[in-house]
Regions:
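Short amphipathic alpha-helical segments that mediate assembly, nucleic-acid/protein binding
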Residues: 2-3, 205
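Low-complexity, Gly/Ser/Thr/Pro-rich intrinsically disordered linker/tail segments
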Residues: 160-216
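...with weaker cross-activation on analogous glycine-rich loops/strands in unrelated enzymes
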Residues: 80-165
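N-terminal capping segments
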Residues: 17-85, 204-216
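Acidic Ser/Thr/Pro-rich low-complexity disordered segments
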Residues: 72-94, 165-183
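Sec-dependent N-terminal signal peptides
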Residues: 3-13
C-alpha cells in the first residue's frame, strides 16, 4: 500500500514538474478553439471575436492566431507577402523548407512524417500550373501519425477549410474550423510526397509538403 502511494506521489510530482512542450501548447490552444467556438466560417478576410466564440478565418489566419497566442516570437519569424497582413500557406511552406538547412531557436524542421507530434504544423504549396486561388494549405497536427500501409499514414488534423476531411467535426453544410482525418504518402526517406484530403478512394494529390515544429 505504501509503495503504491509512493509511486502515485512520484508520478504526480513528475507531471507537475514537466511542463507542456510549446508544440503541445499550440495543439491545446487549437483544440480549445475547436471545442468552444460558437460560429466559424472560412474566409480570407479575418474577423475574430474570442469572447463570442466567433471566427471568420482561412487556414493560415487560423494557425497564425494560435501562434500569436502561444508563441508570438515564432510567428514573427514567418515571412509575409506584400499587401497581406499575415503569413499565408506558401509562406509557411517556404519558411519550413528553409529550416531544413538553416534551423533557428524558434522553429525546427520535421523531416520525416512519423516524427510528427501534436501541435506540429504541416504546410503544402500548390504548383502555379494548378491555377488555384489559394497558395496552399496549412494544418495543425492533432494526433501522432498512424501507419496504415508501408508508405501511407493517417493523421488527425485541426484546420480551417472549405472542404471536409474524413470523420470531420464540421456539420454537413458548414465550413470554417474543424478537425478530421487525412492520409499522407511518404517516400523512402519518410518525407511526405502526396496526400488524400478526405478518402483513400479518391485520387491522391501530389503537392510540395513540409513540416515544422515551434520551439520558442
Amino acid at each position: 500500500m505504501k509503495y503504491a502511494i509512493l509511486c502515485s506521489l512520484l508520478w504526480l510530482t513528475h507531471s507537475i514538474a514537466t511542463p507542456l512542450s510549446l508544440s503541445d501548447e499550440v495543439f491545446q490552444e487549437a483544440q480549445h478553439i475547436l471545442q468552444t467556438q460558437q460560429e466559424s466560417h472560412y474566409d480570407h478576410k479575418t474577423v475574430i471575436n474570442e469572447s463570442k466564440g466567433y471566427y471568420r478565418v482561412d487556414c493560415s489566419s487560423f494557425v497564425c492566431h494560435v501562434l500569436r497566442k502561444k508563441s508570438p516570437l515564432a510567428l514573427a519569424m514567418l515571412p509575409i507577402d506584400v499587401h497581406h497582413v499575415h503569413a499565408r500557406a506558401q509562406n509557411f511552406y517556404d519558411y519550413f523548407k528553409q529550416l531544413e538547412s538553416v534551423p533557428n531557436a524558434h522553429w525546427m524542421a520535421v523531416k520525416t512524417l512519423f516524427d510528427l507530434e501534436r501541435g506540429d504544423i504541416i504546410a503544402w504549396k500548390y504548383d502555379l500550373s494548378s491555377h488555384k486561388k489559394d497558395t496552399g494549405h496549412v494544418v495543425i497536427v492533432a494526433e501522432k501519425p498512424i501507419q496504415e500501409e508501408q508508405t501511407l499514414y493517417r493523421i488527425r488534423v485541426i484546420d480551417a477549410s472549405k472542404g471536409k476531411h474524413a470523420n470531420d467535426t464540421r456539420a454537413k453544410e458548414s465550413d470554417g474550423i474543424g478537425s478530421g482525418d487525412m492520409w499522407f504518402r511518404v517516400n523512402e526517406k519518410g518525407a511526405p510526397i502526396g496526400l488524400y484530403w478526405s478518402s483513400k478512394e479518391k485520387k491522391e494529390r501530389q503537392h510540395f509538403i513540409v513540416m515544422g515544429r515551434v520551439q520558442h
